[in-house]
A protein has these predicted regions:
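S-adenosyl-L-methionine
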Residues: 103-149
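Rossmann-like AdoMet
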Residues: 1-57, 62, 80-107
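Glycine-rich SAM-binding Motif I of class I
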Residues: 72-76
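A short glycine-rich, Lys/Arg-flanked "PGG" loop and its adjoining helix->strand segment in the class I
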Residues: 169-184
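Conserved beta-strand signature within the Rossmann-like core of class I S-adenosyl-L-methionine
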Residues: 185-192
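Core SAM-dependent methyltransferase catalytic element
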Residues: 204-227
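Short SAM/SAH-binding signature in class I
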Residues: 137-139, 152-160
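Conserved S-adenosyl-L-methionine
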Residues: 68-70, 93
């Protein structure tokens, strides 16, 4: 399937797929979307709530599962976020981008860590890699349907192509597997705020919040596994 590089409104790049009329990140700002949806509303929220419950991350590292590794931007901004919180990050991707696309995306230069961005993409699949002193990365090449973890993760970044393009990635069955993969009080965050997506999340047991979205989107969703 044809893929093209697009410059988004905040100057960062994304990959555009003209056959689907879909982008890997928001055309209104790839970096802004990653920071708002996954860092500010996901990671920082979870850390704040966990610290209020006296969690010791040095003894119990934060475990993140990303649905849709894609360009590696979400992993990159997470690795750069907070050196006080050890993170074990598992990223699932069925169709990795190629080396040429990695170079053109240039997130390493944008964020001032070119070697780190190359390492994130060049390190092998299905193995654990130390990206920096507080961030471990495991990349798994498989489909969302193959995710079958149980009570394993604190936080899920759900970054699939939109439900209008690939509705099969936003079904009750997909969210049931995501719910099962989370620990109690685990959180799933996504840029999407579609009504059917919210209802599918609620159908499997998630408590779902509609929150202000990133630039170009009025709302986004955050779902919590509250037992």
């Amino acid at each position: 399937m044809k893929r093209e590089i697009m410059i988004t409104d905040d100057g960062s790049k994304t990959i555009h797929m003209p056959d689907l009329n879909e982008q890997y990140h928001s055309k209104h700002g790839a970096l802004q979307e990653a920071l708002h949806v996954f860092i500010n509303t996901g990671l920082e929220h979870f850390i704040e709530v966990s610290l209020s419950r006296k969690r010791n991350f040095q003894q119990n590292p934060l475990k993140i599962l990303e649905y849709g590794f894609g360009t590696g931007l979400n992993a990159m901004v997470t690795a750069l976020h907070d050196s006080k919180t050890p993170v074990e990050y598992t990223a699932v991707e069925a169709y990795p981008i190629n080396e040429e696309e990695v170079l053109v995306m240039d997130y390493g230069k944008l964020l001032g860590h070119e070697a780190m961005y190359k390492h994130i993409h060049q390190c092998g699949w299905e193995k654990t890699h130390k990206i920096n002193n507080h961030f471990l990365l495991i990349k798994q090449q498989k489909t969302f349907e193959q995710i079958a973890d149980q009570d394993s993760y604190d936080l899920i970044y759900f970054d699939a192509f939109g439900p209008s393009t690939q509705p099969e990635l936003w079904t009750v069955d997909i969210f049931k597997a995501a719910y099962n993969a989370l620990k109690s009080n685990g959180v799933l965050t996504t840029y999407c705020a579609a009504g059917q997506v919210r209802r599918n999340m609620q159908a499997v047991g998630f408590k779902v919040e509609r929150l202000p979205g990133p630039p170009g989107k009025r709302e986004m969703l955050r779902a919590t596994k509250s037992l």
